[in-house]
Amino acid sequence: MNSPQQPFATIPQPRPDGTLQVTITYLQMTRAPTGSAGRSRVDDLAILRVRKPSVAFYRFLYNHVGEPWLWYERRALEDDVLAAILNDSKVHIYVLYRAGAPAGYVELDYRVSDEVELAYFGLFPEQIGIGLGPWLLRWAVETAWASGPSRLIVNTCDLDHPKAIIVYQRAGFSPYRQETCTITDPRSAPFWNQPPAGSP
């Protein structure tokens, strides 16, 4: 998640050596929360599962949600590798629509037995700040728990919105591990400025 007013507020300036130091926090939820997401206070919403989305459509979602936060892992994948993930029946993509247009997405990964990973979750920058984030997260948590796993996991890092970890904790996640690593700044990679092939 990010802020429409200052979308790059937490992103460090490029370093001369082309690297970034990132602290990753891993969180888990070992019991389903009580209650339900209910209705959002924002009107004209729909959440639809996209079965086997095209690579172009997925990249549109991933890049639009993730670019302000330097999401790069899926961006760096070749199309055939990404397509294999998207075509896996245990990877579920849900798109949030507002007034008929994409507003964000959720990716739930069921590939590990008895565990669900909230692999990706976020809103388009223009949809942030109106109360959609916590509601969509609660919806994602309820959907993940419906399969009866032992735990639900997610991770966030200090490139994300500064309130991201607070939102996860309020939803019921608890940190269980943290690590700091050095990565190549994705802004220096050829794929970063490469336009996606095709169109959504």
Pin down the residues of each PLM region.
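Acyl-donor-binding surface of acyltransferase catalytic domains
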Residues: 1-51
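Conserved active-site alpha-helix within GNAT-family acetyltransferase domains
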Residues: 5-13, 159-178, 185
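Short amphipathic alpha-helix that is part of the acyltransferase structural core
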Residues: 39-74, 194-195, 200
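A conserved beta-strand-loop-helix scaffold within acyl/acetyltransferase catalytic domains
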Residues: 73-80, 86-125
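Short acidic/polar active-site loop segments enriched in Thr and Asp
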Residues: 92, 150, 174
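Conserved glycine-rich acetyl-CoA-binding loop
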Residues: 124-138, 159-163, 170
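Conserved beta-strand-loop-alpha-helix junction that forms the acyl-donor binding cleft
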Residues: 128, 154-164, 181-187, 191-192
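Conserved GNAT acetyl-CoA-binding A-motif
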Residues: 144-156
